[in-house]
Amino acid sequence: MSFSFSQPCPSGALLLVVVSSLLLWENVASVPLSSNETDGYPLSINGLFHNAMRLTWNIKNLNMELRKTYTVNQVSEKLYENYMLDFIEDMEYLVKALTCCHNYSIKTPENLDEAQQIPFNEFPKLILSRMWAWNETSKVLLTTLRSIPGMHDDVISLAKNIETKLAELFEYTQSILNSIYGTTTTGNVEYTVFSGLEDLKSSDEEFSLFDLCKFSYCLRVDIHMVELYLKLLECVVYVSSDVCLSKNIRDAS
């Protein structure tokens, strides 16, 4: 089987992004921020962070459950055993299969030098590009699953829950960024929808399973990245940039 992929996501790049982002906070003031409103009620920045982090946790759990439920109900036992055996025995295949996701306007840095070039004012685009991409991709996934004859109801229900939680996380994330940066310029954020979900309709079980596993992997990677950036923002807001920039991180630069 041959598959097409978008840009590679090098090993260790996620850690580099997190470390490098800490190096960019020296000029960020740690000051109280204004409240936002959700559903007509005032919600403090603390509440926004709390709800956003809760949603990332919910999405990760739903994502794991989706993969498990799909595998149990839609994939033959023989194929699953063979597929997992390929992953375990062929690490090169695993890396190739599950390390390419969306193309973003701000790509994940491949080394620390690249990571340090990301300016503070690019962080909203970095986060929102991922949130917008998954908002749209989750809608495509749900539509695709609903169109497949015999698709198990539990799979569709989990996909719907993921779509709902992603939309909620997007709203909270926007509110957080608006509080920190002022009115966030979201109009210029580019995003791409995850490609290949049509393979879920394939009569070839292997194509379908691969597509679902790739979707699940890429969602996990991006939600983890958003979660880490939110933790960084929360640290700077409530503590200080000096504390968030530990001596070890300064020395590592």
Curated annotation (Swiss-Prot):
Subcellular location: Secreted
Tissue localization of expression: Expression restricted to the placental tissue. Expressed only in the spongiotrophoblasts.
InterPro entries xrefs: 4_helix_cytokine-like_core (IPR009079), Somatotropin/Prolactin (IPR001400), Somatotropin_CS (IPR018116)
Matches recorded under Pfam families: Hormone_1
Glycosylation site positions: N36, N103, N135
Coiled coil: none
Keywords recorded for this protein, A-Z: Disulfide bond, Glycoprotein, Hormone, Secreted, Signal
Domain of life of the source: Eukaryota
Single GO MF descriptor: hormone activity
UniProt xrefs under PROSITE patterns: SOMATOTROPIN_2
Extent of the signal sequence: 1-30
S-S bridge residues: C101-C218, C235-C244
GO annotation, cellular component aspect: extracellular region
Cited PANTHER family: PROLACTIN-7A2, SOMATOTROPIN,PROLACTIN
Family to which the UniProt record says this protein belongs: Belongs to the somatotropin/prolactin family.
Name of the molecule in the record: Prolactin-7A2
Organism taxonomic ancestry: Eukaryota, Metazoa, Chordata, Craniata, Vertebrata
Gene: Prl7a2
